UniProtKB/Swiss-Prot annotation:
Compartments where located: Nucleus
Ranges annotated as biased composition (Low complexity): 263-289
Gene: LDB2
Protein name: LIM domain-binding protein 2
GO cellular component: nucleus; transcription regulator complex
Keywords associated with the record: Nucleus
GO biological process, one term: negative regulation of transcription by RNA polymerase II
Polar residues bias: start-end ranges: 339-371
InterPro entries associated with the record: LID, LIM-bd/SEUSS
Source lineage: Eukaryota, Metazoa, Chordata, Craniata, Vertebrata
Function: Binds to the LIM domain of a wide variety of LIM domain-containing transcription factors.
Pfam families assigned: LID, LIM_bind
Stretches the record annotates as Disordered: 244-289, 325-371
Entry keyword Nucleotidyltransferase: no
């Protein structure tokens, strides 16, 4: 029995040299799974440094966390910044919660240039409460997450809209306290409000005051100013931003027409035709036909295509440019040399002169030889 050919690049996972797989982008839902594992690894004596490290691992520096729900007195919406997110998660456990994790079902992912959006309409936040009695609370709602599209894949925006919640009590507890009406009454009361403890709700209400004061506290810590001076400085800067004139909208640069330069051949032909005539006839023809000064040059622009502006029947735009380097008397001294050129024979077409009544600009610029 012949054995399979040995692959020199194959490395057994059980051998001493195990080859790792090629790294790939982590799925957004897996980041939530990693966050659940990190929350389960929390100890009872976790300090603020642990919560700051937790927020740094899973949240961007400019991340925001928003909670929307409806209480007895109306709908509520709380949004906190990155500096207050660690404290929010710590208040959940300080309110009597022993375990916290999130379950995402049928989530939809959409990829953008610099972010990944996860929209889960069936998200459940599960919390285990040990006080005053063992209770499992399932808070259902819609969770919308925005991750940064990079290697860290941290959360940029967190928006959890709570629809309903359920508090589950073990059935085995009821027979144990069937004869105690006070315990049964206590079991019938809810220990949370829309799945959130009173400790967390009080912190969210406090964040409404703390969030605008972040600038004051940061300025006080940086410049060591008194609270009154910090407030004056912040109000003055806010007033400056309000009275500052609005920025002018950027104007789009106007597209310039491309000018067609005079070719060398046309320049040589025109100079040869002009030198064939005498000095007096050249001045008269220039004055009669063009009537331009010696320093003006007529330039014909190309018609603009591909969505540009068109003139009447696509006429070319003629622009007058001033040529300071042009000298009308230049080349007059070479007239004698040109007339004595051997190219001007008796039957040469260059030696024949056009009729006097023929204009310089004609539809057929090539002169016919006189018979």
């Amino acid at each position: 029995m012949s054995s399979a050919p040995h692959d020199p690049f194959y490395s057994s996972p059980f051998g001493p040299f195990y080859r790792r797989h090629t790294p790939y982008m982590v799925q957004p839902e897996y980041r939530i799974y990693e966050m659940n594992k990190r929350l389960q690894a929390r100890s009872e004596d976790s300090d603020n440094l642990w919560w700051d490290a937790f927020a740094t691992e899973f949240f961007e520096d400019d991340a925001t966390l928003t909670l929307s729900f409806c209480l007895e007195d109306g709908p509520k919406r709380y949004t906190i910044g990155r500096t207050l997110i660690p404290r929010y998660f710590s208040t959940v456990f300080e309110g009597g919660v022993t375990d916290l994790y999130y379950i995402l079902k049928h989530s939809k992912e959409s990829y953008h240039n610099s972010s990944i959006t996860v929209d889960c309409d069936q998200c459940t936040m599960v919390t285990q409460h040990g006080k005053p009695m063992f209770t499992k609370v399932c808070t259902e709602g819609r969770l919308i997450l925005e991750f940064t599209f990079d290697d860290l894949m941290r959360i940029k925006t967190w928006h959890f809209t709570i629809r309903q919640y359920r508090e589950l009590v073990p059935r085995s507890i009821l027979p144990m306290h069937a004869q105690d009406p006070q315990v049964l009454e206590q079991l019938s009361k809810n220990i949370t409000r829309m799945g959130l403890t009173n400790f967390t709700l009080n912190y969210l209400r406090l964040c409404v005051i703390l969030e605008p004061m972040q600038e004051l506290m940061s300025r006080h810590k940086t410049y060591n100013l008194s609270p009154r001076d910090c407030l004056k400085t912040c109000l003055f800067q806010k007033w400056q931003r309000m009275v500052a004139p609005p920025a002018e909208p950027t104007r789009q640069p106007t597209t310039k027409r491309r000018k067609r330069k005079n070719s060398t051949s046309s320049t040589s032909n025109s100079s040869a035709g002009n030198n064939a005539n005498s000095t007096n006839s050249k001045k008269k023809s220039a004055a009669a036909n063009l009537s331009l000064s010696s320093q003006d040059v007529m330039v014909v622009g190309e018609p603009t295509l591909m969505g540009g502006e068109f003139g009447d029947e696509d006429e070319r735009l003629i622009t007058r440019l001033e040529n300071t380097q042009y000298d009308a008397a230049n080349g007059m001294d070479d007239e004698e040399d040109f007339n004595n050129s051997p190219a001007l024979g008796n039957n040469s077409p260059w030696n024949s002169k056009p009729p006097a009544n023929q204009e310089t600009k004609s539809e057929n610029p090539t002169p016919q030889a006189s018979q």
